[in-house]
Amino acid sequence: MNQKDSLDKRVDLPEKFVLTDEFKDIFNQMENTKTNLFITGKAGCGKSTLLEYFRQKTKKNFAVLSFTGLASLRVRGNTIHSFFKFPPRFIRQYDPDIRLHRNPAVLKNLDAIIIDECSAVRADLLDAIDESLKKIEKMKKFLEGYRLF
């Protein structure tokens, strides 16, 4: 199966899935507010299930990104580097290799960017994401106008 097939394939929620009040609250925040969220928890607590529930129920346009290729396959997303076309190295501030996104309309139409395992993402990559988005929207503040989960 290639990556596109894995991105398009629907994944069923776990058989024992129960929509708890906590899940409802988090989904409501993801769906109806402009709040940036940092969702954390130990292995098996339901983070991936929440992502799949959001993927199936949302009306939002969003991208799912991760730091590594293996992680991006697991969440049916893209790597940060491939999505933004970043070079595979440390990225300096105002790096000339941070260019306008290959398809600015894709970024302009996004309601949210979900970064899986965000705590593993280096600071230079977060800065590069911010710089790349600023080239699209002329933002003034860090990640202004984009929601991160």
Describe every region a protein language model picked out.
Residues 1-149:
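Conserved ATP-binding/catalytic motifs of P-loop helicase motor domains
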